[in-house]
Amino acid sequence: MQRALRAALTLSRVIIISAFVLVIFTSPTQAQTQITTGTIQGTVIDANGAALPDTNVELKNIDTNFSRTASTDEEGRFIALQLPPGRYTLTITKSGFATLVVENAEVTVGSSLNLPLQMKVSGVQETVTINATPTVDTSKTESSTTLNELAVRSTPILGRKFEDLLTLTPGVSVVQGPDGDEITFAGQRGVFNNVSLDGGDYNNGFFGEQLGGQRAAIDITLEAVKEFQVVATGASAEFGRTAGGVINVITKSGTNGVHGSAFHFQRMEALTADTSDGKPLRDFHREQFGGTIGGPIKQDKAFYFFAFEGIRENLKRDNLSAQIGDTPCPVPTPTIGANEALINSNGDCQRLALTQFIKTTRNQVEDLPVDHPIKNYAFLSKVDWDLNNSNKLAVSYNYDYSKNTNQTFDVATYGNSANGIEGPSKINVVNVNLFTTLSPTKVNEAHFSYSRELRPRSTVTSNVPADTGVGFAPSFRFGFPFFLEPNVDELLWRTHTKDNFSWISGNHTFKFGGEWIHTLNDQTFRGFFTGRYLFDSATGFLRYASPQAAGGFGPSVLECFNTSGAFTGWRTQALGEACPAGSSAGGPLLLYLQNGISTGISGVPPPGKNIAKNDDYGLFVQDSWRATPYLTLNYGLRWEAQILPGPVIPPTQTAYASLLGNPNFPSDGTLHSPKKEFQPRVGFAWDLSKKGTSVLRASYGIFYGRQNMLSQVGSLTDNGAQQFGVTCATSFAFTCFGASTRPPTWPNIVPVSPGGGIPFGASVRVFSKDYANPRIYTTNVQFEHQLATDFTVYFDFTHSQGVHLTRFININRTGSFAATPLFPNLGDIFVTSAVGKSNYNGFTAGVRKRLSKRYQFEGNYVLSKDKDDDSNERDPFTDRSFNPFNLSLDYSVSDRDIRHKFNFYSFVELGWGIEGTFRVQGRTAQPITPASGRTATNRNSERKDNDYFSFDWRIQRPFRFGESMALTPMFEMFNTFNNANNINPLTGAALFDFSGFLRTGVGDPRQVQLAVKFTF
């Protein structure tokens, strides 16, 4: 009750502040960014430069005949808000002047087209037609780019996933992360981004990524995308729930004519080069097919659009069926009894020894080639209905199905059992938008969306239940991945309700609104339920797991070393043997983790089960003020709150109950909800030339990221009461916290009886009592200059400073900084804290040419430096600090730091009906900590071998027949020069990797894609 009262009081304060701002700004209120629509504004003057008030302006969409009227004010200005993207004809009329017609004025999502118009006196009826729009936008203050229909349609994309177009825009990079590719804006974490589809939230609130994430080959059919806007920095107060970038995706609509398409794209092994290490893509083929159709339900009133796309793909990897390294093993069946030294020195002998051992002892074949089949299809339907002159309704439905077997891991040294089945995942999204014109100066947009994502994940069939990692280089893996043991059932659904109101008065455009997102996640996460073993070497594993008759010391063994690091012998733990005096255990089992053991306490959910909800609230008010004909000011305030779930059981019943009164214990057992997220945003655009050819833009704002639910769940379930875990490690002298026993017999689990209550040494997870959501302070300055008609250059500088970044710190670790645990009665204590920081500086130089004279292009170069003390996106299982009590030692260049980046894109009509599109992408390597191990000063002090360069291109020739039909064959080539483009997302030793999705090795080789498309 008290919590609800506090939330109500906070909301009341925000409403009062918003109302106060409203009163201040109602010298009532030039055009602002629209999430799903665009704006056309302009100034009408006569031949002498005098303003022409009361001039009538009619705007008509060429494809649907949707129309809007406006009239100029005393200063000759007009604004038409909330225009659906498309091409418009403007007709400007005034008594005594020749009618002025502007053709092909293109409105894109989020754009504000500013037209300087001049009318000439005429005593007779006369029409003057022009066909030109400004090259430089002199009213926008943010650093944003709109990828129009031509860019979406013509750019060669290897997988036809719309997210791969984002790197065409400056300030956006794709970096290799532990859960797949991450989209980073101005150096920020990928989980900070906000993706919207047709105005509705298109994010998975649990994983902190777009729906479908990296698992789905596609989540929206590219054929349905009309255009999208990318706001890298400087977003206005209307945009929330982001400390990174904003991506607005707008889908196509039907028109007065019936139009459609059918297409088929094909890649295959015969048209693919060997990878840079000389290996073919075995049995590779990819078929991508689909089509669209759209047209009128009723002319000028209602329209329909449908799109479908399917994918069928397979790829066979050799994995452990092929030799490892350059030297084959000289012994066909190496064993530790006869060949221990040979196994230690030869990676291929390790492969044979391990796979033969597992086949013999577990009847599990680990050395077969691995198929990676993909089955994916996406469908979108949309209806647009002009209800009357004042109301326009748009409803869209997006569905995606994805099932990808053996797509969890793509690592050459992983066995057949170390993989998972991603799916079948199903995404359902419904978006409803109602656009209402109350008067020529007042418009409203009401929105509701519902999304539901079912994302099951399971292991492949295996007789090895435990996730088993063996060795450092090479690093092998067998058994159920720890996060899929044996499966994860995850269902997320959310609703998004918002309303925005815009009001034009004089030289102000005032806008305010609010939104509410309700998210519910229902899952059973069986992480570490069947255990995870990490062994230092192949022979160490074989010694540990083999009985003495086979040359081992099993069922569990100690590897002893003296103080100088010299090996002193093996000891069998099952016999109660310990290391000799002066020696200590150093292996072979470096770490064992187990979770999901029930305490038997009544009134708590079963292990792994969690139903959690989040509520996100937002209010904003903003004004765009045309202070002078050459200066536009944008300013606003946004407030947000994220209401986190309450504890499953009272904190006084948890394993850490006795510590709640201890001032050194970092948590009170609850998740504190951030409710005071006030975010001022300001910006200006200054037309320096006073001719619309040179503009200086600048913006500053505070932006809050939201906390994904994956980071929340552990603190709800891992409380020692619902479930507890055990940890066995070298630092515990190979006893196990959470159980009074020695490490288990591989591949079994620690035999702890459920129902025994909370044990001594149970591991827990908590939220810090002073937790706050990540906060980013961003400043951007940009200069853009028109060199010639349709041709501009631009220079951009961005500075972003991050505070309160999420870090996962295990405060009960021991090491050189602590000889004994801080709280000896507990095992690991992972704290979700807000102590991280970051700093990004980036400079961009670019050129841009709009389509004219049969070609367009854009190129940009980015020089940047990105620093932080923890680049962890959402991995709650890993403490990446060197010393949890001195986090300043971790501050260095970020995992995402790409010092140099270059992008170029062009579309050219080559002649004879042939069209060409060319794309170049290049970036330098990401940093990594030396393989020798982390020290106090060497975090990310070296560079990986994952620098990237790719030259992609497409040639196509439409063959037209009839009035509106065309058949277009296409020839595409990707990675033309067959660059290695190595994939290395690891941030440390592969043995200790806890990624939920991992691909390593060489990148995609040169590939040819053949396609044909029929349009009508």
How would you describe each model-predicted region?
Residues 794-927:
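Gram-negative outer-membrane beta-barrel transporters
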Residues 175, 459, 600-601, 647-679, ...:
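Solvent-exposed loop/turn elements at secondary-structure boundaries
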Residues 97-120, 124-253, 268-274, 286, ...:
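Periplasmic N-terminal accessory/gating domains of Gram-negative outer-membrane beta-barrel systems
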Residues 790, 912-934, 945-950, 956-1016:
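C-terminal beta-signal and adjacent terminal beta-strands/loops
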Residues 190, 252-254, 298-300, 388-390, ...:
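Outer-membrane beta-barrel channels and translocator barrels
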Residues 3, 9, 13-148, 223:
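Periplasm-facing N-terminal accessory domains of Gram-negative outer-membrane beta-barrel systems
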Residues 209-210, 223-230, 237-246, 252-343, ...:
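Outer-membrane beta-barrel translocator/receptor signature
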